[in-house]
Regions:
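Transmembrane alpha-helices
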Residues: 5, 35, 88, 94-107, ...
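Transmembrane-helix boundary motif in ABC transporter permease subunits
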Residues: 2-34, 50, 108-110, 124, ...
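Transmembrane alpha-helices and adjacent helix-loop boundaries
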Residues: 36-45
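Helix-boundary and loop/linker segments of multi-pass membrane transporters
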Residues: 19-23, 68-76, 131
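The alpha-helix within a helix-turn-helix
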Residues: 113
């Protein structure tokens, strides 16, 4: 549930931005989200392992900036690393269906809500979110099922403390 809720919190704003404001770069950004889905799952996990590791990219940057003196253990071989890895790997699976449902909303419906006196938050709450909700549900189901049954990620980045139901 933590992975699914994190994906919703991170993915919905991205999907909304792509659907409403991305302009001519919309499909280029969407393509960048789709391309990692064609990569091997194991390769993505090893990539995350090299980013989150003790000598990984995050720890190197933090040491270079002088924020830390020794590598943080927060990023690898614990439950946090499993959650971070699953969120990053599964994020496109919630962005794409949510984007699709939000992109199909005609702009004249949103304009009509403004003409009828809705403020931007009210238009989002009563028009945009209910129409785009089915895409969010589909993406949430994808993420929940894949995160629930994943057993490779806890083995490769979680160490002995990484736990999911699949393991």
């Amino acid at each position: 549930l933590i992975v699914m809720s994190s994906c919703i919190l991170l993915g919905y704003p991205v999907a909304y931005f792509l659907a409403r404001y991305a302009g001519r770069f919309k499909y280029a950004i969407l393509l960048m989200l789709i391309i990692p889905l064609f990569m091997s799952y194991i390769i993505k996990i090893y990539m995350m392992r090299s980013i989150l590791g003790y000598s990984g990219l995050i720890n190197k940057i933090l040491k270079m900036l002088g924020i830390i003196e020794k590598p943080l253990e927060f990023f690898l071989w614990n439950q946090n690393s499993v959650i971070i890895t699953l969120v990053i790997i599964l994020l496109p699976l919630i962005i794409i269906p949510t984007f699709t449902s939000l992109d199909k909303i005609p702009s004249n419906i949103i304009e009509a809500s403004f003409d009828l006196g809705c403020k931007p938050f009210q238009a989002f709450k009563y028009v945009i979110f209910p129409i785009g909700f089915p895409g969010l549900v589909v993406g949430s189901i994808f993420v929940f099922i894949l995160a629930l049954g994943d057993f490779v990620t806890p083995q490769l980045v979680g160490g002995t403390s990484g736990f999911t139901f699949g393991k």
